[in-house]
């Protein structure tokens, strides 16, 4: 990820954070915050489904730009969810950086070992 990409995510997160106490009649994001986390989570589920459908369309010759648009919608709503739980894109980026260089198999084994240790096993 380039610095400008990270900056874009952080700027967008700042705008989203600023909508937390906003008027739900004036802002879509404020409306989502006002409705609570279940509304945000439902929207993420809808957007994730739309990503899957758009990807299947691309596989069949559909427009890749439609997939990009759906992923943008999903990422946006994930940013709203992160903000709702007082998290930021920086938290996700840090986790991705932590995992970088680990194979998926190694990462999963490490996670299982940590879970066992946390549960006294």
UniProtKB/Swiss-Prot annotation:
<dbReference type="GO" id="GO:0000105">
    <property type="term" value="P:L-histidine biosynthetic process"/>
</dbReference>
<keyword id="KW-0547">Nucleotide-binding</keyword>
<keyword id="KW-0963">Cytoplasm</keyword>
<dbReference type="GO" id="GO:0005524">
    <property type="term" value="F:ATP binding"/>
</dbReference>
<keyword id="KW-0028">Amino-acid biosynthesis</keyword>
<dbReference type="Pfam" id="PF01503">
    <property type="entry name" value="PRA-PH"/>
</dbReference>
<dbReference type="InterPro" id="IPR008179">
    <property type="entry name" value="HisE"/>
</dbReference>
<dbReference type="GO" id="GO:0004636">
    <property type="term" value="F:phosphoribosyl-ATP diphosphatase activity"/>
</dbReference>
<comment type="similarity">
    <text>Belongs to the PRA-PH family.</text>
</comment>
<keyword id="KW-0368">Histidine biosynthesis</keyword>
<keyword id="KW-0067">ATP-binding</keyword>
<keyword id="KW-0378">Hydrolase</keyword>
<dbReference type="InterPro" id="IPR021130">
    <property type="entry name" value="PRib-ATP_PPHydrolase-like"/>
</dbReference>
<protein>
    <recommendedName>
        <fullName>Phosphoribosyl-ATP pyrophosphatase</fullName>
        <ecNumber>3.6.1.31</ecNumber>
    </recommendedName>
</protein>
<dbReference type="GO" id="GO:0005737">
    <property type="term" value="C:cytoplasm"/>
</dbReference>
<comment type="pathway">
    <text>Amino-acid biosynthesis; L-histidine biosynthesis; L-histidine from 5-phospho-alpha-D-ribose 1-diphosphate: step 2/9.</text>
</comment>
